[in-house]
């Protein structure tokens, strides 16, 4: 069925892990009649969590689009993971939504996941609604949670449905709009007499009236005159407040037992903005701002907000259409590449179920298979109106591990499989370290990379293991030293001869410099390049641990040659012998890479961060507040001390903190740590190439 944009609601369902987001989505799908049986997260049978890893871990790891059709309205519910290692789902989903439904567990209260969801909605200027799940459980405390919400999120919080425990232990739900109460028997609504919740009832009504009155001058006058609002005025005023962000309505119920979900669904339709209200400012081909509003008759403009890489079906691109329609006959180009995109079938997707649809209309969400060049964040548009929409902002991947191929012969498959994986998870990155030659995969944490490894095996047949990346140390010298390098060898009737005196001295920076200061013709000029080549080749391996030498100047002073036996190769060998003789006597030292740590943490945590930086042999540079009210601690820390910092920061801040780390320079490694690094280098075979 095709819906007009005014009858579509695109809603991000977000919150802390385990708060009941997926169960709520599954329950709403079941109540709509789309499924005959309600799936369970514990059994791995929900429409949202269809990935094998999700079923195994009993948690959402990917965002899922679940369309729920009810009473002439289509609700595109974008169920996103609550685990912090999988925040990419929320980052991509928010770009396709007009509203955020924040789930809060009736048992756990307002946790970090709810805070993050609220901040995400604020940052992206999306309407907000709160649903308190598990409200029928004995240890659920709605009014305590309501206070937490007000403390965390301010005066916009406005209760609309509240629970009341009855004498028989069951829970009824009071609709403050209609001032009626209902209980639920096998998911069916039954009206009952209004339970007595004491002075709270009048206070709740008064608070709701006050919030609604602030949205309209006429309602404000009526409020001050003490006149009650009609149900229509309540709904209209509440919807206006939700659109402007003045009001964040709070509902409650039980997804497992299908309680009060009818009231939630009705008010999602009445209070949350429709897809018709969406407007995005992009850029045209001349980088000028262009506002795209939802309009079926305008040139096509659509946005790829999510990609799924399937080894059998191919790439599946999830698309939000902003204007026009998208169908198999649409003439569109990729604004990033300028190339046309041939469209195959357009699809409606519900979890893993795909259904053909004639077109994806303006305001709606659907999918297209096997697009040639499009990737997440790309804009598909009519060539007559080329527009590039803003790309999503993804969390920074700071947890690095090295890749080791499990099966011999799979080396060539790894980069291709990882490229496919990165298509569907842009928070993952993959590089080859030019120093260590290791393949490095980066993600948001240990779970993130564990799941990536599992997907590579299950989806692409590539098996890898992860190990701690090697640290790219360097070596240098502290003093000058001069040494002779004499290469003389007789092979049959032809000999090899090269003789040099080279002075090696430390210099600032990380270069290896070569100079010559030869008087007379002791070493002919045509052999100078060979001497330099020998020095540079030798400097690839230090004498302590085999790491590259930096901050070194080599000056050719003297030497000798043979008119017949001297050659380029002989002088290369002579230069290497001089290097090997001089460097051990020049005070060789190991250098460790140092990076700048920029950690964003709540106001309560800077002291802990500074203490941890000191423990990790770092130096605190300063601290400043950021635009989100958090504190930003800047420090310099050795790279070798940063491997587990992601885990530390997450535990310290309960997932609120994040950081970046960028290499800045090399510094001398403390002598007490040299022996350990040298031993590790020998175990890794750092001297193998040099000795060969």
Question: In which residue ranges do the predicted regions lie?
Answer:
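Structural and coupling elements of P-loop NTPases
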Residues: 1-692
């Amino acid at each position: 069925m095709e819906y007009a944009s005014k009858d579509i609601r695109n809603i991000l369902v977000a919150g802390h892990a385990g708060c009941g987001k997926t169960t709520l989505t599954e329950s709403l799908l079941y109540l709509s009649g789309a499924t005959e049986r309600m799936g369970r997260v514990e059994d791995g049978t929900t429409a949202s969590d269809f990935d094998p890893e999700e079923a195994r871990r009993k948690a959402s790891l990917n965002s899922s689009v679940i369309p729920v059709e009810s009473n002439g309205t289509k609700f595109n519910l974008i169920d996103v993971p609550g685990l912090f290692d999988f925040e990419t789902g929320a980052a991509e989903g928010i770009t396709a939504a007009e509203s955020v439904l924040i789930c809060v567990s009736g048992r756990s209260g307002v946790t970090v996941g709810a805070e993050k969801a609220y901040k995400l909605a604020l940052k992206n200027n999306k309407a907000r609604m709160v649903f308190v799940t598990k409200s029928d459980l004995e240890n659920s405390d709605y009014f305590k949670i309501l206070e937490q919400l007000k403390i965390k999120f301010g005066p916009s919080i406005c209760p609309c449905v509240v629970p009341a425990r009855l004498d028989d232990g069951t829970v009824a739900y009071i609709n403050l709009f209609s001032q009626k109460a209902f209980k639920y028997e096998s998911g069916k609504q039954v009206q009952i007499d209004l339970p007595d919740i004491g002075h709270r009832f009048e206070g709740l009504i008064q608070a709701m009236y006050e919030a609604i009155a602030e949205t309209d001058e006429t309602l404000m006058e009526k409020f001050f005159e003490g006149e009650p609002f009609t149900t229509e005025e309540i709904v209209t005023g509440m919807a206006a407040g939700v659109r402007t962000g003045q009001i964040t309505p709070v509902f409650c119920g039980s997804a497992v037992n299908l309680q009060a979900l009818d009231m939630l669904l009705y008010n999602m339709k009445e209070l949350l903005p429709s897809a018709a209200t969406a407007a995005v400012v992009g850029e045209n081909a001349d980088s000028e701002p262009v506002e795209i509003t939802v309009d079926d008759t305008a040139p096509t403009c659509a946005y790829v907000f999510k990609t799924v890489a399937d080894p059998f079906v191919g790439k599946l691109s999830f698309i939000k259409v902003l204007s026009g329609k998208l169908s198999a006959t649409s003439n569109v180009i990729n604004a990033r590449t300028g190339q046309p995109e041939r469209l195959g079938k357009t699809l409606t997707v519900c979890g893993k179920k795909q259904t053909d649809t004639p077109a994806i209309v303006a305001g709606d969400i659907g999918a297209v298979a096997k697009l040639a060049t499009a990737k997440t964040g790309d804009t598909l548009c009519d060539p007559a109106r080329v527009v590039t929409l803003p790309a999503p902002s993804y969390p920074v991947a700071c947890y690095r591990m090295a890749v080791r191929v499990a099966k011999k012969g799979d080396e060539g498959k790894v980069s291709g499989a990882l490229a496919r994986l990165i298509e569907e998870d842009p928070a993952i990155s993959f590089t080859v370290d030019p120093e260590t030659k290791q393949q490095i995969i980066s993600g948001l944490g240990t779970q993130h990379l564990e799941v990536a490894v599992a997907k590579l095996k299950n989806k692409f047949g590539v098996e890898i293991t992860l190990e701690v990346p090697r640290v790219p140390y360097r070596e240098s010298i502290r003093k000058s030293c001069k040494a002779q390098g004499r290469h003389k060898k007789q092979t049959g009737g032809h000999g090899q001869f090269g003789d040099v005196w080279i002075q090696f001295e430390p210099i600032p920076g990380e270069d290896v410099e070569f100079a010559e200061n030869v008087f007379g013709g002791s070493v002919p000029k045509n052999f100078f390049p060979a001497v330099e080549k020998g020095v540079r080749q030798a400097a690839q391996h230090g004498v302590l641990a085999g790491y590259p030498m930096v901050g070194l100047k080599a000056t050719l002073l003297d030497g000798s040659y043979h008119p017949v036996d001297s050659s380029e190769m002989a002088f290369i060998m002579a230069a290497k012998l001089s290097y090997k003789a001089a460097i051990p006597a020049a005070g060789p030292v190991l250098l460790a890479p140092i990076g700048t740590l920029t950690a964003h943490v709540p106001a309560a945590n800077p002291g802990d961060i500074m203490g941890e930086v000191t423990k990790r042999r770092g130096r605190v540079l300063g601290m400043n507040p950021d635009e989100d009210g958090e504190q930003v601690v800047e420090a310099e820390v050795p790279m070798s001390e940063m491997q587990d910092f992601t885990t530390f920061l997450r535990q310290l801040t309960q997932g609120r903190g994040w950081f970046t780390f960028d290499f800045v320079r090399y510094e001398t490694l403390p002598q007490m740590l040299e022996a350990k690094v040298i031993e590790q280098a020998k175990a890794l075979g750092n001297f193998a190439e040099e000795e060969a």
